[in-house]
Each structure stands twice: as structure tokens, then as C-alpha cells.
Regions:
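Juxtamembrane "pre-transmembrane" interface segments
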Residues: 1-19, 120
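Residue-level signature of catalytic and energy-coupling elements of molecular machines
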Residues: 3, 35, 39, 48, ...
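Helix-loop junctions and hydrophobic alpha-helical segments within the transmembrane domains
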Residues: 4-5, 79, 84-109
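Internal alpha-helical transmembrane segments of multi-pass membrane proteins, especially GPCRs
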Residues: 4-12, 36, 60-64, 100, ...
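Hydrophobic alpha-helical transmembrane bundles that constitute the permease/transmembrane domains
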Residues: 10-15, 38-43, 111-115
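Hydrophobic transmembrane alpha-helices and their membrane-interface caps
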Residues: 16, 20-79, 83
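Hydrophobic, glycine/alanine-rich multi-pass transmembrane helices and their short helix-loop junctions
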Residues: 20-25, 44-59, 108-159
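Interfacial helix-loop-helix hairpins and adjacent transmembrane helices
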Residues: 88, 93-97, 127, 151-169
Length: 169
């Protein structure tokens, strides 16, 4: 099997684990929307790679692996906070916004600091600079798309009247 097949297989396993763990501890709906954020971010990043004339290769796959944990973590942090605030009394939409506001600054700080660190890779010159150029491109696209997804799409999907209960607990 080639490397891409292995990464895709591991991606499916990771997606299943996210669904199970979040379904057990939060709700199936929350688990579903967090899981959806992963392929949305990855597909958006692939689209961005195409726009910049880059391709999927060993270095870009390394970038995907590197950033995937951050993308999943940010989605989980936002979703858990929204889930917590949705269970409180009051206006549902205000509670969703409060859940987002509670954790958005640490998430944004993480995203920006990672983007700054990865941007320094663009300063590398020579053969090595040309060789790893696609790594920060992947990370920057993924983080930017993930940021848009977790600040706009994820809260909108989780803003429903129904308070979901955990699947098992």
C-alpha cells in the first residue's frame, strides 16, 4: 500500500474515534459536526494547494499530518464549550455565542502562533527551502479554513433548540 492509502485509512480510524468519544461524552450531533469539520478543512486545503500550484506529495502529506491534530482539537474545544453553554437557561443563540466567546481567544492565539512559526519556513533558502515550501502552505491553508469553520459553520450547526444528551452516559 502506498503512503496516501495508509494516511486515508488512518484518517478513517481517527474520524471513527472522534465520533465515538464525542458521541459518548457529549452527543452524537456534536460528534457528527466536529467530524464533518475535519474533511471540510482537508478538502479546502487541497483546493488551496491547487490554487497555489502545489501538489500532494510526501512533504504536503507531512503538513496534513502535522496540522490535523490542531484542527481536531480546535473543533472539539469550541464544540464542548458550546455544548456546555447550551445546557444553561436563557436564549439559545446567546448561549451558543457565549460558548464560542469563552474559548475563541485561546483558540485564535494557538492558530496565530502556529501560523507565525510555520511562516518562518518561507524564509528558508536554497534547495531545502524549495523542498519544504509546501509544508507551511498546507498548514496555513488548513488553519485558515479551520478557523472559518469553527467560528462560523460549527456554531451555526450546533445552534439548535434541542439539548442533546450523550449517547452512552
Amino acid at each position: 500500500a502506498n503512503r496516501l492509502d495508509i494516511i486515508i485509512k488512518n484518517g478513517y480510524i481517527g474520524l471513527a474515534l472522534v465520533l465515538v468519544v464525542l458521541g459518548v461524552f457529549l452527543s452524537l450531533k456534536t460528534a457528527f459536526w466536529v467530524a464533518v469539520s475535519i474533511p471540510v478543512t482537508l478538502l479546502g486545503t487541497v483546493f488551496g494547494l491547487g490554487l497555489t500550484g502545489n501538489t500532494i506529495n510526501l512533504i504536503s502529506l507531512s503538513g496534513f499530518i502535522l496540522v490535523l491534530g490542531i484542527v481536531v482539537d480546535d473543533s472539539i474545544v469550541i464544540a464542548e464549550s458550546i455544548h456546555h453553554y447550551k445546557s444553561k437557561e436563557g436564549n439559545l443563540y446567546k448561549n451558543v455565542v457565549m460558548g464560542l466567546k469563552r474559548v475563541i481567544m485561546p483558540v485564535v492565539t494557538t492558530i496565530i502562533s502556529t501560523m507565525l512559526v510555520m511562516s518562518s519556513f518561507f524564509l528558508m533558502s536554497g534547495v531545502l527551502g524549495k523542498f519544504i515550501y509546501v509544508l507551511p502552505v498546507v498548514v496555513l491553508f488548513a488553519l485558515a479554513i479551520s478557523f472559518l469553520e469553527i467560528t462560523f459553520a460549527l456554531p451555526a450547526h450546533l445552534a439548535t433548540n434541542k439539548i442533546e444528551k450523550p449517547f452512552m452516559i
